[in-house]
Amino acid sequence: MDKSKRPFIKSKRSFRRRLPPIKSGDRIDYRNISLISRFLSEQGKILSKRVHRFTLKQQRLITLAIKQARILSLLPFTKRKGFERSESTPRTNALKPRNKNKQNNQTQF
């Protein structure tokens, strides 16, 4: 057969299916922190169902469980460490100059 008349045959590449993120034995519950924390980003945001290949029902259950765990303070709302205070710093009054015009405009009775 001539090379130009030969039908195009696509090579079959083998691919590996991804394992589901939630196994059938896993229970989606707000108390199961080890399972829930896998579906949060580094900032503490809930990852989309497209990222973890959830079904719509699984995504709703995970979202509700994360929100319940946050309300019950089992999980933090954010995972940022910038808000933690390491040491107390003395406050200075030199941060903002006082506006003298405001004081002069007040009427005395």
UniProtKB/Swiss-Prot annotation:
Organism superkingdom: Eukaryota
Keyword Plastid (UniProt): yes
Ranges where the record places region Disordered: 82-109
GO molecular function (one): small ribosomal subunit rRNA binding
Keyword Ribosomal protein: yes
SUPFAM superfamilies: Ribosomal protein S18
Pfam families: Ribosomal_S18
A single BP term in Gene Ontology: translation
Keyword vocabulary terms for this entry: Plastid, Ribonucleoprotein, Ribosomal protein, RNA-binding, rRNA-binding
Compartments it resides in: Plastid
GO cellular component entries: mitochondrial small ribosomal subunit; plastid
Chief localisation class: plastid
Family statement: Belongs to the bacterial ribosomal protein bS18 family.
Quaternary context: Part of the 30S ribosomal subunit.
Protein name, as recorded: Small ribosomal subunit protein bS18c
Organism of derivation: Cuscuta reflexa (Southern Asian dodder)
Organism taxonomic ancestry: Eukaryota, Viridiplantae, Streptophyta, Embryophyta, Tracheophyta
